[in-house]
């Protein structure tokens, strides 16, 4: 593909302040690297978090273990993180990646095939759109967007530029979840009338943090990006950015997306709800936190079925011995899907009895499995090679649909009333106040373009 110089790209990206798209360079025909022996070069963006499979450390930790995949760059606004990340990539993959503070520099590198985004939520859309425009594939963490309108533009960009864009809803690649969904969609529990997701994860008190000088090596302006400018604050910069409205999608977006993605998939719902209610608040703590730590939402669909999502970030009881999982309620009984087991209980016309159970321990390995690698990353790389975005386990459209549910819940919470939504236009009906939350005021020049 044709390259563009940094000064040229930065100038073009500034044009986005007027709502114009960043001009994408021409994309080579026959981009596919179909041979498994051809190397796919990946850049990982956002490397502060190293745990699990969701943070940047988890991203490069997985990609480095896939044959003929090389992490050639790591990017973060905090340059203090580079030495450890470079050492870890070298240990895992055998090469020392270059380090980049400004994501836009990666867009000029014609040797990078894909970018993997593990940044705070408010950067996901713009990075994804920019990457698509210059012909790079994208793996983007959940929630895929900061606001609902961004998600639709991400889908449009992926399709317009024929990009492979995988959402980081890793359960889509779980054999256990796949088998549970097949059971449900085959009608073995009967007609499902309600699904429910719970996230009861205790979050400590973040307290109060005063503004302070910007640390050496931190590009605070780039961290804020599309968000309003504020003086540097360590709490807003660390993991606690999750709890401030400028950068947060609440725990709904942080973890609710995972649960409701499984609920929506199990119930085979590929449309938005039409009625949304949400209540909650910030309880039992005294701190700078702006978003709720208790939140419950109900979503009603055109055919009358209901979905619910509840978060509790304080000490609380469990449901069915679980503090994180999904439940399905149907004409023949109910089911629970957790991280390790899918359990069914039959109840129609008889005493509640345990039905079929599926355990992850009982599932035979598949040929594509690689020890120590989450299959979601393998699926992404396979589709990058084949150019078949249709084979993604979590295509960006599915990521948008599940993330949008959580945005709708947050909007109902912030407006404080029941909302009526047009699932096809993706607008609230006769409600300018609610519609104002579908997008945001962007700080220039970090505006998501009106046309991608």
Residue ranges: model-predicted function:
Residues 137, 145-222:
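A contiguous active-site-proximal alpha/beta segment in oxidoreductase catalytic domains
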Residues 4, 149, 175, 393-394:
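Residue-level signal for the nucleotide or nucleotide-sugar donor/cofactor binding architecture
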Residues 1-137, 149-164:
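N-terminal glycine-/serine-/threonine-rich beta1-alpha1-beta2 phosphate-ribose binding loop
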């Amino acid at each position: 593909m044709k390259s563009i110089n940094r000064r040229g790209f930065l100038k073009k990206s500034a044009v986005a302040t007027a709502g114009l798209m960043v001009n994408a360079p021409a994309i080579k025909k026959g981009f596919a690297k179909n041979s498994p022996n051809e190397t796919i070069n990946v850049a990982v963006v956002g490397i502060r978090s190293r745990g699990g499979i969701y943070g940047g450390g988890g991203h490069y930790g997985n990609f480095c273990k896939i044959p003929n995949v090389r992490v050639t760059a790591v990017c973060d606004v905090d340059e203090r993180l580079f030495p450890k990340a470079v050492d870890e990539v070298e240990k895992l993959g055998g090469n020392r990646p270059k380090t980049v503070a400004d994501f836009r520099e990666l867009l000029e590198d014609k040797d990078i095939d894909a970018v993997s985004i593990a940044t705070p939520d408010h950067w996901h859309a713009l990075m994804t759109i920019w990457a698509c425009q210059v012909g790079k594939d994208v793996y983007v963490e959940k929630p895929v967007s900061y606001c609902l309108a961004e998600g639709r533009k991400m889908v449009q960009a992926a399709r317009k530029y024929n990009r492979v864009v995988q959402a980081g809803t890793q359960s889509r690649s779980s054999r256990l979840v796949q088998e549970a969904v097949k059971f449900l969609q085959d009608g073995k529990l009967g007609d499902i009338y309600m699904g429910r997701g719970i996230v009861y994860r205790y979050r400590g008190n973040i307290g109060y943090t005063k503004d302070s000088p910007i640390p050496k090596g931190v590009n605070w302006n780039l961290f804020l990006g599309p968000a309003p400018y504020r003086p540097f604050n360590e709490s807003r910069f660390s993991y606690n950015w999750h709890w401030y409205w400028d950068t947060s999608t609440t725990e709904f977006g942080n973890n609710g997306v995972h649960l409701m993605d499984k609920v929506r998939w199990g119930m085979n719902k590929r449309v938005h709800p039409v009625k949304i209610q949400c209540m909650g608040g910030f309880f039992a703590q005294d701190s700078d936190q702006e978003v709720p730590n208790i939140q419950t939402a109900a979503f009603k669909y055109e055919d009358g079925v209901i979905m619910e999502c509840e978060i509790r970030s304080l000490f609380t009881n469990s449901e069915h011995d679980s503090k994180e999982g999904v439940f399905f309620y149907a004409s023949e009984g109910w089911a629970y899907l957790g991280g390790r087991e899918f359990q069914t209980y039959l109840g129609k016309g008889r005493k509640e009895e345990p039905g079929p159970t599926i355990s992850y321990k009982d599932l035979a390995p598949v040929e594509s499995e690689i020890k120590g690698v989450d299959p979601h990353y393998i699926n992404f790389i396979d589709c990058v090679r084949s150019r078949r975005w249709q084979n993604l386990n979590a295509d960006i459209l599915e990521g948008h649909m599940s993330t949008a549910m959580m945005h709708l819940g947050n909007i109902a919470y912030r407006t404080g009333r029941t909302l009526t939504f047009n699932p096809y236009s993706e607008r609230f009906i006769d409600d300018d106040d609610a519609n104002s939350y579908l997008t945001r005021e962007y700080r220039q020049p970090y505006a998501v373009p009106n046309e991608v």
